[in-house]
Amino acid sequence: MRKPIIAGNWKMNKVSKEALDLVNQIKDEVHKTEVEVVVCCPFTVLSQVQKALVGTNLKLGAQNMHWEEDGAYTGEISANMLKDIGVEYVILGHSERRQYFNETDETVNKKVKKAIKENLKPIVCIGESLEEREANQTFDVIKKQLLGAFEGVPAEAMDNVVLAYEPIWAIGTGKTASSEEAQTVIAYIRSLIEEKYGVDISEEVRIQYGGSVKASNATEIMNETDIDGALVGGASLKAEEFLGIINF
């Protein structure tokens, strides 16, 4: 039985006071121990949020990291830096990173390997654009991204990996893949994992859906067989809405 995982991706939002206000509104309301809940904050508030999460059911996540240990990489953050302040999860390969910061399957692969090596749990994002979907290329794109991200990653490393299917056309647009559409693609992702790593691992790896998830559609999405959670964007910035998703 795969434990559902709901991760809130705050993106570039919330200064210190706002971050703590939001965490304080939700931390005592997360009682469902059968659901794992992660808040993925901007780097600037991670340390403060970590302190606020002590003794709660919430886990701490970051939104990105570099694949090198340290060095002359101005503006970057390493896995060790994240571990040092208590980060457990890290989002890698988000479509906005690919779109605006030229991330590729190759750089995502380097980050995945480094995260695993440093015992961080990567939430690895894959998904197609509207143009690719309309050209019936969804499965081709998904396969390329998934195999690229996990090139050279051994089977035993998959225990702590989470995948997130985030169709780019549904991110921040208000459009949402129907639960059936999401299930179809996520079932395909699971079949790719089975091909690469075998049936046991494919049945254990958790796969989230991300793309305009909100309280009103969370239950329908989460009821699908292969969907094990949600990577939540805008709705995670509002306590009531995020709690509505967590308590689907």
From Swiss-Prot:
Gene3D superfamilies: Aldolase class I
Binding site for substrate: N9, W10, K11, G172, S212, G233, G234
Protein location: Cytoplasm
Pathways involved: Carbohydrate biosynthesis; gluconeogenesis; Carbohydrate degradation; glycolysis; D-glyceraldehyde 3-phosphate from glycerone phosphate: step 1/1
Active site positions: H94 (electrophile), E166 (proton acceptor)
Molecular function per GO: triose-phosphate isomerase activity
Record keyword Isomerase present: yes
Top-level enzyme category: isomerase
InterPro entries: Aldolase_TIM (IPR013785), TIM_sf (IPR035990), TrioseP_Isoase_bac/euk (IPR022896), Triosephosphate_isomerase (IPR000652), Triosephosphate_isomerase_AS (IPR020861)
Reactions this protein catalyses: D-glyceraldehyde 3-phosphate = dihydroxyacetone phosphate
Listed GO CC annotations: cytosol
CDD domains, sorted: TIM
GO terms classed as biological process: gluconeogenesis; glyceraldehyde-3-phosphate biosynthetic process; glycerol catabolic process; glycolytic process
Enzyme nomenclature, EC number: 5.3.1.1
Keyword Cytoplasm: yes
Keyword terms, alphabetized: Cytoplasm, Gluconeogenesis, Glycolysis, Isomerase
PROSITE patterns the record matches: TIM_1 (PS00171), TIM_2 (PS51440)
Subunit details: Homodimer.
Family indicated by similarity: Belongs to the triosephosphate isomerase family.
Primary role: Involved in the gluconeogenesis. Catalyzes stereospecifically the conversion of dihydroxyacetone phosphate (DHAP) to D-glyceraldehyde-3-phosphate (G3P).
The protein's name in its UniProt record: Triosephosphate isomerase
